[in-house]
């Protein structure tokens, strides 16, 4: 790699809107994010499961596609 053309790689403090903070490496010293693994529904287990099968059956019944 050529010297003095790459951005400086420093330790980065990441702050989430939920209050969670963690450190990683980046070319910026501080990052602010809206959602992280601490508050994302996929990781917390509070995700909603859509009952698509019921909707399909309702559509077929409504338009007599059985």
Curated annotation (Swiss-Prot):
Q: Which InterPro entries does the entry link to? A: Ribosomal_bL28/bL31-like_sf, Ribosomal_bL31, Ribosomal_bL31_A, Ribosomal_bL31_sf
Q: Which cofactor does it need?
A: Zn(2+)
GO term, biological process aspect, one:
translation
Keywords for this entry?
Answer: Metal-binding, Ribonucleoprotein, Ribosomal protein, RNA-binding, rRNA-binding, Zinc
Superkingdom classification of source: Bacteria
Gene3D superfamilies the record matches? Ribosomal protein L31
- Report the co-factor binding details: Binds 1 zinc ion per subunit.
Question: Known Pfam families for this protein?
Answer: Ribosomal_L31
Which GO cellular component terms, listed alphabetically, does the Swiss-Prot or TrEMBL entry include?
A: ribonucleoprotein complex; ribosome
Is Iron set as a keyword in this record?
no
| Record: residues binding Zn(2+) | 16, 18, 36, 39
Q: Which GO terms describe its molecular function?
A: metal ion binding; rRNA binding; structural constituent of ribosome
The family assignment reads:
Belongs to the bacterial ribosomal protein bL31 family. Type A subfamily.
Cited HAMAP family: Ribosomal_bL31_1 (MF_00501)
- Quaternary context: Part of the 50S ribosomal subunit.
Write out the function statement from the record. Binds the 23S rRNA.
What name does the UniProt record give this protein?
Large ribosomal subunit protein bL31
Q: Which organism is it from?
A: Campylobacter jejuni subsp. jejuni serotype O:2 (strain ATCC 700819 / NCTC 11168)
Coding gene?
rpmE
